[in-house]
A protein has these predicted regions:
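Internal alpha/beta scaffold segment
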Residues: 136, 141-162, 187
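Glycine-centered loop/turn motifs
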Residues: 106-110, 145-146, 189-199
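Short, conserved secondary-structure transition motifs
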Residues: 161-178, 182
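Single conserved hydrophobic/aromatic residue that forms the stacking wall/gate
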Residues: 205-214
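Acidic, proline/glycine-enriched N-terminal capping motif
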Residues: 2-116, 121
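Helix N-cap motif at beta-to-alpha junctions
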Residues: 88, 141-146, 173-175
Length: 214
């Protein structure tokens, strides 16, 4: 790396638009709909799946955030990208895409999956959710899987699209305690490792100020 560049770090910052219309980059680097929660804490962002994902906040050091997720709980809005794959041949397509057997994943369950090139090189990984017998979401890490789905879907009865879903993660040993407090009904029981469930959450908008929203 150039010695001059090695003295700098590069980041993306949120700046007021001062009444000007958004620039083109505002549409190619969309922010999480709940990013307003982070704005009071001078966030720094990176580009992840062409989405903005927070890397740093002024209220916590890297070490403090690490120990929070190890010993307590954090709430984080990510750039992970869910893609929906549905239709009679959805399972067939996904078994062509991923190295682990999708047939074993039952509705209401998730599975860690990763996609590889034909020579074995890894494209990306993520969590596959089986929402129904013929409907899946793949919440992927950074990488281009959409084109790979399309390339392998020829001749199959399957639909591949972006459901316009954003991922927020509740992480840490106290994550289930927090979830029990925010969902409207009782936490699904049993709620096992890699289970998925559809629950409703009440959000209360109490103030026009981003600092005071709850």
């Amino acid at each position: 790396m150039d010695t001059i560049l090695s003295k700098f770090r590069f980041t993306i910052k949120a700046l007021p638009n001062n009444g000007h219309r958004p620039r083109e980059l505002a549409r190619t680097m969309p922010a999480h709909p709940l990013s307003y929660m982070e704005l009071p804490y001078d966030p720094e962002y990176a580009l992840y799946n062409s989405r903005l994902t927070p890397e740093a906040l002024s209220t916590a050091t890297d070490d403090e955030m690490y120990w929070a997720v190890r010993t307590n709980v954090i709430f984080r809005h990510t750039g992970e990208l869910p893609i929906e794959i549905c239709g009679p041949d959805a399972e067939t397509l996904l078994n062509k895409m991923f190295t682990r057997n999708v047939t074993k994943v039952k509705p209401g369950r998730c599975s860690y999956q990763f996609a590889c090139y034909h020579d074995g090189g890894m494209i990306t990984d993520g969590v596959l959710l089986r929402l129904a017998e013929d409907r899946f979401w793949m919440a992927q890490a950074d990488g281009d899987l959409f084109s790979w789905y399309k390339a392998h879907a020829e001749g199959l009865d399957v639909t591949i699209h972006d459901p316009n879903v954003w991922v927020s993660q509740v992480q840490g040993p106290k994550s289930l305690e927090l979830l029990s407090e925010v969902i409207d009904d009782a936490k699904p029981e049993p709620f096992r490792y890699f289970d998925c469930a559809d629950v409703s959450i009440c959000l209360l908008y109490t103030s026009p100020s981003p600092r005071d929203r709850g």
